[in-house]
């Protein structure tokens, strides 16, 4: 029997199923989505936890003309009545916004236009459909205005595009549309970083408002992202809108790998002897009521072990991003926060109020907001909830502890490079009898001293269960 391959970086469900890759069955997501039906559902999970692959699987299941054999032998195939009713029954609009970025709004809008235009182009048969009127065919053609190889939209046409496409698909098929939007919050993140946040909020609010709120041709929609952006920001007025976060028990096994799934993949590739290392380095996340491993880490490390049985665990997840959020957090830390970071690195937990609804321009306005974002994006995890609703936070595993220590080391290196300036400030503060400045500088000195010991911590992070 052919040995299946490890799907490193492959996010297309059909490719995995057709090309001999190992697949951890997450088709319970389909069943739970239909049984817990909402008009619009948003799943928030950290990056590299299988969101895009999950969305690709949903498209393969619901899309008219799908190859039903892709689901042979998978969990969902056991629910015959559900498959008969829903598999291959809907027109599906699927867009991923993970590449929508630019140094300016105009650059980002052009990328966004290309993504929308490419999806519309997949339904080019609508231009000749005998189910559409002459006017409707012209409306479709009006969505595909191309100049010099680029899709051209004015803002009004852009924001109406998904709703109009839904209407035309409904007219052609006689069936309402499923809309899937992957990584919905990436354009907002990039816009905030590059100074055009409010323009992007306005654009996405208009697009989502028409596609998800006032769309009579929508069966249901599913969105994924890392953060839950405040409903008042871009989801204004959406009814029957459900957000499923890492705090919720529903769908808690649908993204990321469970302990059982990790043991199965290790057994399949004869790597079971490495279970303890994988658990120490890549386990520790708690979604709802389930312990979860980072799938990106597990697959990458298994791939390394298959090539070299002596390979050591690496920081795969943390090295897939710049992790500027952690450095920003350390830069802004006050004395209390620095003490809390020390406790986290020592394997303890801290208790914090978590806000699950923020806007990007609120994230770094306070340390409290940064705690919330570190939790939501996977740098911290939940150990429990207090009676008054505060969340017990801890560093999930060895990999993330290494990341915090690395960022503290960078901060320490940068600040000690300015020791001469700091000493001068300290002396001036004494001469000026500026007690507040003296306290701040002395606190920073203590943090530097403590940092020297923190960056040499090497014992494994304790799992607090």
Predicted features along the sequence, with ranges:
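Phosphate-binding site recognition
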Residues: 1-454
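Single conserved hydrophobic/aromatic residue that forms the stacking wall/gate
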Residues: 455-465
